[in-house]
């Protein structure tokens, strides 16, 4: 017999992963998007935060993709634990704001849009028990106005009822 339900525990242990070792110039993006003709490129905030060099690699990739007319999607996916060692939220915001003008499809929840781009949903309670849909619409309108290059902006809405129930 135990005591209660253990909360979820996530570990972003990507230290020394092959992707974290990538540096600008390691991938021939002109070959990927030009010669090979990749039509869609997806990346995101987790990859950008893996090391000091991966954010530069993402920037290099999205610029090359746009040169060839490749659709670029990006999941903000802010993870404080990954950004902590390379400059924290301030660095995350600077990096994501630099990348955003090259993105066609931007994905993220309200916390991602706040942490990574500085947009906030007004009207939600701190525990997200009751969502203000007008606040979400207003934030998305602000995002679309700031980044007219976004062809699609996607988010999720979740009301937290309890530790085990979400709507």
Predicted features and spans:
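Conserved N-terminal subdomain of the carbohydrate kinase-like
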Residues: 1-45, 69
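Flexible, glycine/proline-enriched loop segments at strand-loop-helix junctions
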Residues: 9, 13-17, 21, 43-53, ...
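Acidic/polar active-site rim loop that often engages polyanionic ligands
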Residues: 39-46, 118-124
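Active-site core of PLP-dependent enzymes with the aminotransferase class I/II
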Residues: 51-59, 164
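Surface-exposed amphipathic alpha-helices with a cationic face
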Residues: 59-66, 144
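Short, conserved structural micro-motifs that define repeat-unit consensus positions
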Residues: 66-72
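Conserved phosphate/ATP/ADP-binding segment of small-molecule kinases
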Residues: 68, 79-167
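Acidic/charged, solvent-exposed loop-and-adjacent secondary-structure segments enriched in E/D, K/R, S/T
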Residues: 75
């Amino acid at each position: 017999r135990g005591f209660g339900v253990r909360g979820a525990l996530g570990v972003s242990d990507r230290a020394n992963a092959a992707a974290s070792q990538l540096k600008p110039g390691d991938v021939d993006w002109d070959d990927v998007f030009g010669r090979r003709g990749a039509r869609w490129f997806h990346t995101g905030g987790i990859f950008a935060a893996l090391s000091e060099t991966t954010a530069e690699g993402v920037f290099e990739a999205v610029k090359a993709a746009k040169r060839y007319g490749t659709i670029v999607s990006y999941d903000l996916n802010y993870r404080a634990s990954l950004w902590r060692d390379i400059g924290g939220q301030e660095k995350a915001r600077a990096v994501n704001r630099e990348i955003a003008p090259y993105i066609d499809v931007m994905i993220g929840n309200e916390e991602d849009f706040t942490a990574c781009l500085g947009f906030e949903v007004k009207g939600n309670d701190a525990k997200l028990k009751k969502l203000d849909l007008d606040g979400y619409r207003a934030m998305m309108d602000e995002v679309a106005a700031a980044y007219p290059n976004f062809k699609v902006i996607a988010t999720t809405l979740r009301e937290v009822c309890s530790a085990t129930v979400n709507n």
